């Protein structure tokens, strides 16, 4: 009996130490609390990679830059933390991207 209890305690401790990789939905105060906890009160806006003006056309040199951006689809659609963690589940690792 003691061995089973001891094994259960160690198993629970191992699960708690390994972290939770299961995605969860975080909204409102819960999102702010989790972000504060994960980032140790030092969170900021997630940055997108810099795209230099010479790469503006994305290899679509025959198009005007504005039209190339429209066809790209991904550019200009930066997702904020609410889109990533409130509208759909996210993991703690995704929250770390905002630290």
Curated annotation (Swiss-Prot):
Keyword Signal: yes
Record localization: Secreted
Cellular component GO terms held in the UniProt record: extracellular space
Matching PROSITE patterns: INSULIN (PS00262)
Major location category of this protein: secreted
Disulfide bridges in this chain: 27-86, 39-99, 85-90
Record's keyword terms, sorted: Cleavage on pair of basic residues, Disulfide bond, Hormone, Secreted, Signal
Superkingdom of origin: Eukaryota
Position of the signal peptide: 1-19
GO molecular function, one term: hormone activity
Keyword Protein biosynthesis assigned: no
Propeptide position ranges: 48-76
InterPro entries: Bombyxin, Insulin-like, Insulin-like_sf, Insulin_CS, Insulin_family
Family that this chain belongs to: Belongs to the insulin family.
Subunit structure: Heterodimer of a B chain and an A chain linked by two disulfide bonds.
PANTHER family tied to this protein: INSULIN-LIKE PEPTIDE 1-RELATED (PTHR13647:SF4), INSULIN-LIKE PEPTIDE 2-RELATED (PTHR13647)
Role played: Brain peptide responsible for activation of prothoracic glands to produce ecdysone in insects.
Identification of the protein by name: Bombyxin A-1 homolog
Organism: Samia cynthia
